């Protein structure tokens, strides 16, 4: 019985991992879109609210994605192994770090690159997971894309 529940949790974490990865990719894609028909030609979706909305639209309804509340607010630095302290403590929730041009304090739209990192905390339903120290499984998805411009 526990083996079946553990297998179900493994399938669930795989499912949510794929959903979070797709959300990061779609959010970055949203921020890179260039509309040549706009007057003047520009990227009308290159802001934090639109990028976050794109990420939220790609995850299941039981997943909560928000912008982080503390520093760093947009760009994560260092190796991903050092980001452990930035994961949300609430189960089945994630923080979306949206980094325009590698600048944590940038207020305007990205001109070169957009990086979207999603740090997601998955909570297994199997009580056996707590025995092996997996009360929360941390899932990371990261995507960097080049901002489109008029050639």
Region locations from a protein language model:
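Alpha-helical transmembrane segments
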Residues: 12-22
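N-terminal single-pass transmembrane signal-anchor helix
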Residues: 1-12
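Short, conserved structural patches
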Residues: 17, 25-151
């Amino acid at each position: 019985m526990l083996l079946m529940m553990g297998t179900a949790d493994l399938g669930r974490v795989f499912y949510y991992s794929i959903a979070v990865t797709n959300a990061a990719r779609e959010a970055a894609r949203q921020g890179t879109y260039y509309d040549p028909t706009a007057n003047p030609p520009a990227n009308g979706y290159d802001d934090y609210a639109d990028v976050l909305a794109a990420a939220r639209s790609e995850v299941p309804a039981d997943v909560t994605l928000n912008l982080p509340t503390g520093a760093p607010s947009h760009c994560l630095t260092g190796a991903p192994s050092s980001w452990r302290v930035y994961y949300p403590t609430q189960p089945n929730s994630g923080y979306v770090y949206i980094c325009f041009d590698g600048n944590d304090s940038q207020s305007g739209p990205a001109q070169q690159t957009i990086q979207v990192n999603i740090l997601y905390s998955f909570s297994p339903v199997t009580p056996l997971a707590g025995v092996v120290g997996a009360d929360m499984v941390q899932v990371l998805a990261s995507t960097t894309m080049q901002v489109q411009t008029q050639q």
